[in-house]
Amino acid sequence: MQLPTQQVAVLDAASTDDPQRIEALAADTDYPPETIAGAALALEAEGLVAVTETTTTTVSLTDEGHAYATDGLPEVRLYRAALDAGADDAPVEMGSVIGAAGLDGPQVDIALSNYARKGYGTIDSGALAADPDADPENDPEADALATLTDGDSVDDDAVVDQLASRDLVTVSERTVRSVTLTEAGVTELMAGVEATDEVGELTPELLASGEWADVEFADYNVAADAADHTPGKTHVLRQAAERVTDVLVGMGFQEMAGPHVDADFYINDCLFMPQDHPARNHWDRFALSNPARIDELPDALVERVERAHREGAGDDGDGYHSPWDEDFARALALRGHTTSLTARHLAGLADADVEAPARYFSVEKAYRNDTLDATHLLEFFQIEGWVLADDLSVRDLMGTFREFYSQFGIHDLQFKPTYNPYTEPSFELFGRHPETGELIEIGNSGIFRPEMLDPLDVDGDVMAWGLALERLLMLMTGFEDIRDVHGTLCDVGFLRNAEVVY
């Protein structure tokens, strides 16, 4: 029997009663482990050896995991500080508890997001309450960190998965192959096996000399182990944003852009948002301290917007009948929605005067001081869009949504009437989650009111919307927690292995 030299070496080194690992055979034969692995699999196909595989899993603490094992998990530290502050009797101001817990930077977000998840208490409107019955001494994640620090193993796979999702541990799997000589292999060895040289690569020299016709080429082993590479790739959220852009451009829209930091005048006042609206207080927005206000606003536009707030629009208009303060409108903040871009464009400040028909969109970030949970982050992508034309109706708006979402394979949409200060009629959009079957809110929309359009000198109807890109991605991929795709708790494994769907 003739076999390649490497396979003969494996047969000679293998044993019938003592399984030899690939690494041991490589050391005995002076061949690389990957060469021996390929030879062993080829011999197994011939029935001359048996190859067994065992997988070992190793769980190791990361630097952050070591730190938490020593100092305590951020949510546990937050809970203990909350108890010290009396939060088990009545809610206390969240900032003071965070300071008392010694948390800063990313640890704050980590503590807040895990605090409620573990049942340590609740967070509402900047106030923190603690559950007196919670038991941080038996926190399974803290116990697992301590166990790993002692060099022992953790048997609870769910806890290990949770720690891995928080980047507190690394989980590595290693496949070990062992080779055992079969009776058929022994028979062939006793009968005599002749070693033949094989060529692994067709070279220009072999072609030029013609020797390629007389040599035997080695078979490629596509089942051999290969290194696991994780090259950089476009983030799934950015992929979704780019696809949304392509879809809307294909529907005839033009892209718009504008400042992330803007005056409240454009963020709220131009949208007929009253200055005493709850969403305009310091709890719900990120205000700038330096500079705190914009220097100049267009005088004529300010006058028209103020009149709309005080008196409404048209002969039968009726405003808010409340004070309107230009200094308040000059305050600078991170935009809480990208509708500020719409206001700037409709007013002709970001582009030339817009005339009907016109379609504009943006896929940009907005910033809100929300409570972190499975569907809310402090910053998120908003799909802003609007259409300026004559005689627009809610049916036009619904039809636009059905066409847009159908491009992503989403057809089960539901609409619910709602109230917005700047649109009438208004409605929210809901889509059905592919995994849970639940309806989740994916956007808000409506027809702009005259009180908004008249001060901007817009002639025509405008239908507009703000859609959540992250929630569109939820419907596309089936993940359930928005923190899995970005933020300090993102699932790196999900990001690395997510399919590129286009």
UniProtKB/Swiss-Prot annotation:
Record keywords: Aminoacyl-tRNA synthetase, ATP-binding, Cytoplasm, Ligase, Magnesium, Metal-binding, Nucleotide-binding, Protein biosynthesis
GO biological process: phenylalanyl-tRNA aminoacylation
Entry note: cofactor: Binds 2 magnesium ions per tetramer.
Residues annotated as binding L-phenylalanine: 339, 382-384, 422, 448
Alphabetical list of SUPFAM superfamilies matching this protein: Class II aaRS and biotin synthetases
Chain positions recorded as Mg(2+) binding sites: 424
Pfam family, any one: tRNA-synt_2d
CC terms in the record's Gene Ontology section: cytoplasm
Main EC class the enzyme belongs to: ligase
Location relative to the cell: Cytoplasm
InterPro entries reported for this sequence: aa-tRNA-synth_II (IPR006195), aa-tRNA-synth_II/BPL/LPL (IPR045864), Phe-tRNA-synth_IIc_asu (IPR004529), Phe_tRNA_ligase_alpha_bac/arc (IPR022917), Phenylalanyl-tRNA_Synthase (IPR002319), WH-like_DNA-bd_sf (IPR036388)
Residues making up the signal peptide according to the UniProt record: none
Keyword Calcium included in the entry's annotation: no
EC numbers: 6.1.1.20
Subunit structure comment from the entry: Tetramer of two alpha and two beta subunits.
Stated name of the protein: Phenylalanine--tRNA ligase alpha subunit
Name of the coding gene: pheS
